[in-house]
Swiss-Prot record:
Part of the Rad50/Mre11 complex, which is involved in the early steps of DNA double-strand break (DSB) repair. The complex may facilitate opening of the processed DNA ends to aid in the recruitment of HerA and NurA. Mre11 binds to DSB ends and has both double-stranded 3'-5' exonuclease activity and single-stranded endonuclease activity. The keyword Nuclease applies. Pfam families: Metallophos, Mre11_2nd. Nuclease activity is regulated by Rad50. The keyword tRNA processing does not apply. The gene is mre11. Signal peptide: none annotated. This is DNA double-strand break repair protein Mre11. Its cofactor is Mn(2+).
Length: 413
């Protein structure tokens, strides 16, 4: 058996307000589908965020319909779940429209029972768990859910996903053990040990950098986004050390072909994102670093200069000498540490891990792109605070020394 595992396609994303980028996201998806046909896969899994929005434009929907004709015309079924970008809070999503058009099959918890060549349903409480079917293999999954939901429903989640036969699990979630290594600023709703056991392959989405690990003997795989979604997902990062640049290579972009449950990454060439990090004490040093970076910047790349300085100065001249397709300049005063009574204090120590993540995301150049993540972090954090307050109230009441003397206990005796 051979299938393709894609995620985070983000159709319709006019990155940096550039319609050209939405076209590039669509063209990369087209390349991936054509590669799937060439590889003669049996089916395709899209592990969330086919669209960048739950309300894509008519033009974006039209593009999706056109592109999904590629697997349909080659008799390749596509199984999909909703991600945090394209899910709806209630009712059908645009994915269900594509399902009605016969272009893909939506798996997960649904209000209605669905039975056809590639879908079957199992009653779960007030819902139907709709599962994909291909030969003797089942494809289980559900749409993106928040940290607060998993905190309240983890046992339910583990209870409904119990494979009796060969099966794949498809999720669009952050796994903490993985996000801490790949994308520390990402919110994570689950630990690796929270995943239900017994699946032959865990097809994940949500994290935009590719990553492979195992859960027991089964592969746990993030293919990453097809295109570079922000500058955190760079092709190359240049870090100035005061003399020269140290180069950090980012992750490749593409998807996985999985044959007999063994994943193989398929690379797709996409536009380069270059992240240039310069920290300097003087205007002279920063100018020297900017000029030294020029030979490392391809003409058609998107570039971000991340400049940290002691004292601001005009940086408009950078736009005149950097020959790139797109240029963004982010500046910040060096203020990692504050002085308190003559002692150096790490500013992070004043915040919890969740609070610092929110501050980090909110101060990013791509703030608007991270709104969903910030909301998820805050909703989970509020839930935790509420629970801790309740537990605190409960702890204030101790059992009476003599359980039979309730009046003495109430008097404090």
């Amino acid at each position: 058996m051979k299938f393709a595992h894609l995620a985070d396609v983000h159709l319709g994303y006019e990155q940096f307000n550039k319609p050209q980028r939405a076209e590039e996201f669509a063209n990369t998806f087209k390349k991936a589908l054509e590669m799937c046909v060439k590889e003669s896969v049996d089916f395709i899994i899209i592990a969330g965020d086919l669209f960048n929005s739950s309300r894509p434009s008519p033009g974006t929907i039209k593009t999706a319909i056109k592109l999904l004709q590629i697997p349909k015309e080659n008799n390749i079924p596509v199984f999909a779940i909703e991600g945090n970008h394209d899910r709806t809070q209630r009712g059908p999503s645009v994915l269900h429209l594509l399902e009605d058009l016969g272009l893909l099959y939506v798996i997960g918890l649904r209000q209605e029972r669905v039975e056809n060549e590639y879908l079957t349903s199992e009653r779960v409480g007030n819902y139907w768990l709709v599962k994909g079917v291909y030969d003797n293999l089942e494809i289980h999954g559900m749409k993106y859910m928040s940290s607060a939901w998993f905190e309240a429903n983890l046992n339910f989640f583990k209870g409904i996903f119990r494979p009796d036969e060969d099966a794949i699990l498809v999720l669009h979630q952050g796994i903490r053990d993985i996000t801490e290594k790949v994308f520390p600023s990402y919110s994570a709703e689950l630990k690796l040990s929270d995943l239900p056991r017994g699946y032959l392959y865990y097809a994940l989405g949500h994290v935009h950098k590719r990553f492979e690990t195992n859960y027991g003997d089964s592969p746990v795989v993030y293919p990453g986004s097809l295109e570079r979604w922000d500058f955190g997902d760079y092709a190359k990062r240049l870090v100035w050390n005061g003399v020269t640049f140290r180069e950090e290579v980012g992750s490749d972009k593409g998807f996985y072909i999985v044959e007999d449950f063994t994943p193989r990454f398929v690379n797709i060439k996409v536009r380069d994102f270059i992240d240039v990090v310069i920290k300097g004490d003087s205007e002279r040093e920063i100018k020297k670093a900017v000029k030294a970076s020029l030979p490392h910047i391809p003409r058609n790349s998107y570039v971000r200069f991340n400049i940290k300085w002691r004292k601001p100065f005009d940086v408009e001249w950078i736009k005149e000498i950097v020959n790139a397709e797109y240029l963004r300049i982010h500046t910040a005063i060096i203020k990692d540490e504050k002085s308190m009574n003559g002692e150096s204090v790490d500013i992070k120590s004043f915040f919890t891990e969740q609070e610092w993540k929110v501050i980090d995301l909110a101060s990013s150049d791509e703030f608007e792109s991270y709104i969903e993540k910030i909301v998820d972090i805050l909703s989970g954090y509020e839930k935790k605070e509420e629970r801790e307050k309740k537990e605190s109230k409960i702890r204030k009441f101790e059992r009476p020394k003599n359980p039979g003397d309730l009046t003495a206990w109430l008097r404090g005796g």
